[in-house]
Amino acid sequence: MISNFAISRIEGKIESQDSLANQRFPKLNINLDKVSSNNNKLNVDYTFAADYLNGDSEDAKSIGYLKISGTIEITESKEKTVEILKRWDEKHSLPVDLAEEIINGLNFRCSSAGTLLAYSIGLIPPLVISMTKVQEKQ
């Protein structure tokens, strides 16, 4: 269960004011950078990135970006914490239910914070409206 959500770094940049008229909805990416533990608490370092382009083609040029980084704290039993860390170290993945909770939490919080940042520099808000479902690799 997520017990704390912290944003430690926010970046935003536009290439030029003129390019804003051609922006498209951003390409969004959530990366879970690192998973570590402190007793029965897991710390998941993350990066939420929104890349803005001037078109949809492969040769589209970047017109700006938003990047939000931080740490999510998750409280679990000692046994569950050890199990999750072992899985992360071996497969670089998390249990499906935990991954869904983290990704949906990040979508909500980073979309909210990203909207304020995007508005301040003239970019389209990086809103994710639907819930994310995670599936095990087959």
Where are these regions (language model features)?
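N-terminal intrinsically disordered, cationic/polar leader segments
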Residues: 1-105, 119-138
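Helix-rich interaction surfaces within compact, conserved domain-sized segments
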Residues: 103-107, 111-113
